[in-house]
């Protein structure tokens, strides 16, 4: 009994350590700081040189959502020096070392919603130049209106420099105040860094804010850096000629993480450090087990299934947190079953259940749509699907032939079940047959449903497998 209690105690301590690592952005993003080729290093060099050399600069961070444009941002700016318990107590959440699910959900909100590379850079620079940096943050979803944006800039500048803010000031007054502050901060050798989230939304309308800001930065007395963050790769092309001429045209492109890099991240996060308070023998045994799991072919399949739907860092963190929760308390070690259980708990079961109730014809329609997407058809509708269905019938000489009317009813049923949807809101006055549609399930989900469906014709499984492995 005593030995079992001791093992359970060690397992609980290990879970607490691992959860702490998953909740600590310094640990999550430490790999970014170690390599000189990362966007983090490039952005830090750019901003640091602007601060030290007292010059103006501008840069765009472009890439799809969830690929880390903003990690190279919040991780440390606000909460880096505070212990995790302090973060949650400030938010009105009681921190428990065993970490309840509700607390974890809040942690991930902090990790992903405040986002991630800019904050890391700003935190490092604030440590190096504590009195030489002032940060102003705007979001295009909230401040795309020029009047609202200049007012928010004035408010943040007043708050940063302990000045009184006038809510009644006009837009022109706020713009003039911003220009004056840029000049005064430049004379005081202090850099103002403007972080513009959803930058493409600022590049609409007359773009008066961007013009005023970039034009003021042309002055020798000003000292500022503009960092634009956008998921649109053509964000710089949206700028007017007068604005574009004042922009530096520096761009850092972010791409989604590869499967190999995600596996390295998982290995890094799940490995117990040698200097942890846990017994050395246990740490070595645990780390050896983790290495063995990651080298297993089954794990490759789990990772592939996980990243098919979502390959973002926040999704990986949610998965790993569940893996830790499925740790075997008796042995205190993770197993392949821990990863499989975590994956099962994250997969969208309602859609899988819906797929089990479909008719043979509806499965044919889904497989035909999947084939069209694999052929990289940019747009297709019911008529296109029927042509694909006919080509399948002609190629395989199957007996599963249905009339156009019956097929259309099955198509409407799939729309009602929300397994497929219209590609856009255009053409609402068009007949349903001609409106573009898209699949709302992945090829892996479709393949799993075909395997579980006992009435599914073998030809459908062949068709899907052929497309997946071509």
UniProtKB/Swiss-Prot annotation:
This is Origin of replication complex subunit 4. ATP binds at residues 63-70. GO terms for biological process: DNA replication initiation; response to sucrose. PANTHER family: ORIGIN RECOGNITION COMPLEX SUBUNIT 4. It is found in: Nucleus. Belongs to the ORC4 family. Expressed in the shoot apical meristem (SAM), leaves, ears and roots (including root tips). The lineage of its organism: Eukaryota, Viridiplantae, Streptophyta, Embryophyta, Tracheophyta. It comes from Oryza sativa subsp. japonica. GO terms for cellular component: nuclear origin of replication recognition complex. Component of the origin recognition complex (ORC) composed of at least ORC1, ORC2, ORC3, ORC4, ORC5 and ORC6. ORC is regulated in a cell-cycle and development dependent manner. It is sequentially assembled at the exit from anaphase of mitosis and disassembled as cells enter S phase. The gene is ORC4. Induction: Reduced expression upon sucrose depletion-mediated cell proliferation arrest, and accumulates after sucrose treatment. Gene3D superfamilies: P-loop containing nucleotide triphosphate hydrolases. InterPro entries: ORC4, ORC4_C, P-loop_NTPase.
